[in-house]
UniProtKB/Swiss-Prot annotation:
GO molecular-function term, one example from the UniProt record: structural constituent of ribosome
Protein name: Small ribosomal subunit protein cS23
Keywords: Chloroplast, Plastid, Ribonucleoprotein, Ribosomal protein
Entry's family note: Belongs to the chloroplast-specific ribosomal protein cS23 family.
Length: 103
């Protein structure tokens, strides 16, 4: 049975949060809590989690962390005059393998 790692983002006005889920078959199980940015270093917290899990490959870890970096950068650079739904839609198009929950 294929195991898939899924990044889930919570898009908020003043912060963005990320967590990691695992999909096995039709079931999705949370692996982490939400790590928030900029209140804390969500990227560093996820890196620490990934390094502590020997079953997650280095390649998967690098890909996940790169995606987190790109999404956080996208969130930082967004036009705050544009409705967040448009940003979230653009993000889902750019990263079809992630889940984005937002306002």
């Amino acid at each position: 049975m294929k195991k898939e790692l899924i990044l889930k983002f919570l898009w908020l006005e003043k912060s963005i949060a990320v967590c990691l889920d695992q999909k096995v078959g039709d079931s999705i199980t949370p692996l982490t809590e939400f790590f928030f940015w900029p209140q804390k270093d969500a990227w560093e917290e996820m890196k620490n989690f990934l390094e502590s899990q020997s079953w997650i490959t280095q390649s998967d870890s690098v890909n996940l962390l790169n995606n987190i970096t790109e999404v956080i950068n996208f969130w930082q650079e967004r036009d705050t005059n544009v409705i967040d739904r448009k940003h979230i839609s653009n993000l889902r198009e750019k990263f079809p393998d992630i889940i984005v929950i937002g306002q």
